[in-house]
Amino acid sequence: MDVKQNYEQAKKQYEKWGVNVEDALEKLKQIPISIHCWQGDDVTGFEVNQQELSGGIDVTGNYPGKATTPEELRDDLDKALSLIPGMHRVNLHAIYAETNGEAVERDEIEPKHFENWVKWAKENGLGLDFNPTLFSHPKADDGLTLAHPNKEIRDFWIRHTIASRKIAAYMGKELGTSALTNIWTPDGYKDIPSDRLTPRKRLEDSLNQIFEEEIDKEYNVDAVESKLFGIGSEAYVVGSHEFYMGYALKNNKLCLLDTGHYHPTEMVSNKISSMLLYSDELALHVSRPVRWDSDHVVILDDELREIGLEIVRNDALDKVRIGLDFFDASINRIAAWTIGTRNMIKSLLYALLTPNEHLKQLQEEGNFTDRLAIMEELKTYPFGAIWDYYCESMNVPVGESWLTEVKEYEKEVLSKR
């Protein structure tokens, strides 16, 4: 049987549960994933005076073909996007500014330094999201930025983040889709602090200054991102989950949950419903932590499936901004983007094909036997046949055939860098 015939057979199995497969695929087409540019160059960026990666994060591996120019990075993103079904977004960090060889300090970056990104996004029908880069810089060498006791250093990072919001607003206005400005700062201490409160007061004050200027949400939406620990901030991180959850709710900002920024057994999927009870919107960075925030490529594991289910079953497709955040330099970087993004979309399709209302009803009735049995049986339903049909209908490679294109691109382009 061909892809269409397999699809028709699979469709019947889902329809017996009352699942409208065609509606599910139409909904899937409308869900943008914000794809992080930094997988393509190992979080290096294009600053004239480049610094070693810092901020308690790490990239391991040395696979050949890494992008070293904006043009190479956009070409690589073009290739990955051609293998991923749907219309999506690209997430940029401030270090991806294009300054034509001029050394521009981070507190002096402007929209003009991202004109090429906006032009490219327009040509490709993409949205853009943005992040101030509060790491890999001499003024972040001691692990403190927005919570730094030195006002001069603190003010530098405040100016940088204010500039970043303006850049994001420019992107949102130009592209007709609001950009998400996500603030993550590595501030913390390696060993047990003698004062946990004062740095948090400073961070709160810095954020208040950053958000002083109101920006139309049609162009820019602000998010804040917590973290449990990083390399060099094992004992204490200023921007903890509780800090940012409180700040976001009090100040009407989005809380961004990164799946690698919690205890290894703490699941972000378990937080989504609670957050949505008290916040109109929520943002995610979907990653894969292996024993720590290792940022492995996202796979279709239980947690990813649960994240998709929580978004879909709670009617939150228009309330959750889904972004990815992983970087693996040990494998082909275009393959990493493709694997991770396709898996994120697969998790959403799996959720859309689940008879969620029926399963909810079983739970309300206390019928936990049927609930468990059906949830487990659905795992071996012909979901793959629906996925293949979706890929074919969206004119992207079916199954693992995309690997052939990646290998050809590696041979013709990446190997010559």
From Swiss-Prot:
The keyword Nucleotide-binding does not apply. Its main location: cytoplasm. Binds 1 Mn(2+) ion per subunit. SUPFAM superfamilies: Xylose isomerase-like. One of its GO terms (cellular component) is cytoplasm. Belongs to the rhamnose isomerase family. This is L-rhamnose isomerase. The gene is rhaA.
